[in-house]
């Protein structure tokens, strides 16, 4: 699926929902247009906030032959370019920013989604067999299975046999869920209902792994299960969300090739509202073809 097809899908779905089409996240040619790439600076400062846009725009190359080329390159990407060297080693500010981004990534893996936040969204909360974050990181197999209490809660509080079941899980990034939730779940649910699909009760799974959607689909009898889960964070990017969609999942028979994945959902990648429109179209095609993953007709 190319960018033009994605834009057509977004335009069609958002129009049917009566909403404005979101602006694309493509780079602009105007100076300073990308929010993550502020105006480049060359001064090295001990007082600089290492997580700020100014720090990300810092240029560490001393006495460049073509400063304008470095400035344009620095504006064009959020990657670690133009950081300069001190002999064979990175400059102090570049190293400190690397360490700060690494620390931020570790923090988002270890953080918990607050129970108050889940309640504020009006979501039913269930758990996998995991009891704490340490066990979640060391026993991924237990994160693929619901706890007995969770199974009972789904059977008693969720709509059975839906066309589409939407599930939210913390995964490996708490920030991915809390930062993108309001911009992806409401338009996703609205788009699915606008398409005439029977949508199940959305709920939150704490300590969930991707394969847990197979058991959820089997218990609820869902035709399509859509799991929104936090991605493993990269350096300086802790808000990236993934969507794993699967048709008629079964614990014993569903394999990874049966899943369709849309990744890199965040403001600096695929905008959440745009991703919601693409997921709606994907769910419709899965139901039409009765397939997902590599079994879908492209």
From Swiss-Prot:
Q: Give the UniProt keywords, A-Z.
A: Bacterial microcompartment, Cobalamin, Cobalt, Lyase
Annotated adenosylcob(III)alamin binding lies at 210, 231, 261
Q: What is its main location?
A: other
The record's cofactor note says: Binds between the large and small subunits.
Disulfide bridge positions per record: none
Per the record, its GO cellular-component terms are: ethanolamine ammonia-lyase complex; ethanolamine degradation polyhedral organelle
* Reaction(s) catalysed (UniProt annotation): ethanolamine = acetaldehyde + NH4(+)
Q: Where is the protein localized?
A: Bacterial microcompartment
What are its E.C. numbers?
4.3.1.7
Cofactors needed by this protein, per the record, are: adenosylcob(III)alamin
**Listed GO molecular functions?**
cobalamin binding; ethanolamine ammonia-lyase activity
Which biological process terms from the Gene Ontology are attached to this UniProt entry? Answer: amino acid metabolic process; ethanolamine catabolic process
Root EC class: lyase
Record flagged with keyword Lyase = yes
Q: What does this protein do?
A: Catalyzes the deamination of various vicinal amino-alcohols to oxo compounds. Allows this organism to utilize ethanolamine as the sole source of nitrogen and carbon in the presence of external vitamin B12.
HAMAP family tied to this protein: EutC
Q: What is this protein called?
A: Ethanolamine ammonia-lyase small subunit
Natural source organism? Salmonella schwarzengrund (strain CVM19633)
């Amino acid at each position: 699926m190319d960018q033009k097809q994605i834009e057509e899908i977004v335009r069609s779905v958002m129009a049917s929902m009566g909403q404005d089409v979101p602006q694309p996240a493509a780079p602009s040619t105007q100076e300073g247009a990308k929010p993550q790439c502020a105006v480049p600076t060359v001064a090295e400062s001990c007082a600089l906030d290492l997580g700020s846009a100014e720090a990300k725009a810092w240029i560490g190359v001393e006495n460049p032959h073509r400063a304008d080329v470095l400035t344009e390159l620095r504006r064009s990407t959020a990657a670690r370019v133009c950081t300069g060297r001190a002999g064979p080693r990175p400059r102090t500010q570049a190293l400190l920013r690397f360490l700060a981004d690494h620390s931020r990534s570790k923090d988002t893996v270890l953080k918990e989604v607050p129970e108050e936040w889940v309640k504020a969204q009006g979501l039913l909360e269930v758990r996998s067999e995991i009891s704490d974050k340490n066990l979640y990181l060391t026993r991924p197999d237990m994160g693929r299975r619901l706890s007995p209490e969770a199974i009972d809660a789904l059977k008693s509080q969720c709509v059975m046999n839906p066309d589409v079941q939407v599930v939210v899980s913390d995964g490996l990034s708490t920030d991915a869920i809390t930062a993108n939730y309001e911009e992806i779940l409401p338009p996703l649910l609205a788009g699915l209902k606008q398409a005439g699909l029977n949508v199940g009760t959305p709920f939150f799974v704490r300590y969930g792994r991707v394969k847990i959607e197979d058991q959820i689909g089997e218990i609820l009898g869902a035709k399509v299960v859509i799991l929104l889960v936090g991605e493993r964070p990269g350096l300086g990017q802790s808000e990236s969300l993934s969507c794993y969609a699967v048709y008629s999942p079964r614990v014993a028979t569903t394999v990874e090739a049966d899943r369709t994945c849309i990744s890199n959902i965040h403001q600096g990648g695929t905008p959440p509202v745009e991703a919601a429109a693409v997921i709606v179209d994907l769910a419709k095609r899965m139901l039409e073809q009765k397939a997902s993953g590599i079994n879908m007709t492209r």
